[in-house]
Amino acid sequence: MDYIQITKDNIEKEHICCAMSGKQSVMKKEWLKQRFAEGLVFYRSTERGKCFIEYIPAENAWVPIQADGYVYIDCLWVSGSLKGHGYANELLQQCVQDAKGQGRKGLCILSAEGRKREFLSDPKFMAYKGFAVADTSECGINLMYLPFEQDAEPPKFKACAKHPAVEQSGFVLYYTDQCPFTYYWVPRVEEAAREHGIPLKAVHITSK
């Protein structure tokens, strides 16, 4: 498989394989443009389809973790006819090489306890690749890591994510432009909440 790196120089002419609709693509690309200077890397296959990896120095990740010195994987996704050919291994190896070249402590990524959940990494695959659980939130989200040295301090969740809670009744949904699927799901979650009389506040995070 051949891969291409999306950069500030080619992002206008290249498609983002996780964002195929107009609004999804525009907002995702704008978010990426602002992150390239912070060290974000986006590799995708040259073939059409969802086969890509996106990662960034953990200090600049838009997730509530403490993982200085690590590289955080925003998304590793291979789907459809591209599954089962070892492409996820190739993309992950590219990330490992980049992280080691930068002198990083290791990699980290979010998954869920016990099973694969939508929009989170597969814990069984990550464990097979050498990742271990560094921390777990009360809502069952795991922070997994792959240290490059045995004495590397494990990353951890910040307190707000370790013990998530809101003061008001109902639910608060926080989302960013990092994942383009929020433009599909957030309105549908809001609609479902209205239909069932569930208090819901959606918060669009636009800065770290």
Question: What role is predicted for each listed range?
Answer:
Residues 160-195:
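Local sequence-structure signature of Cys/Sec-based thiol-disulfide redox active-site neighborhoods
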Residues 110, 127-144:
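Conserved catalytic-core motifs of GNAT/GCN5-like acyltransferases
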Residues 138-163:
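C-terminal "cap" of GNAT-fold acetyltransferases
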Residues 44, 48-60, 72, 77:
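Conserved beta-strand in the GNAT
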Residues 99-115:
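Conserved GNAT acetyl-CoA-binding A-motif
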Residues 60-73, 83:
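A conserved beta-turn-beta hairpin within the catalytic core of GNAT-like acetyltransferases
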Residues 1-48, 181, 185-189:
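Short amphipathic alpha-helix that is part of the acyltransferase structural core
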Residues 78, 84-99:
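Conserved acetyl-CoA-binding loop-helix of GNAT-fold acetyltransferases
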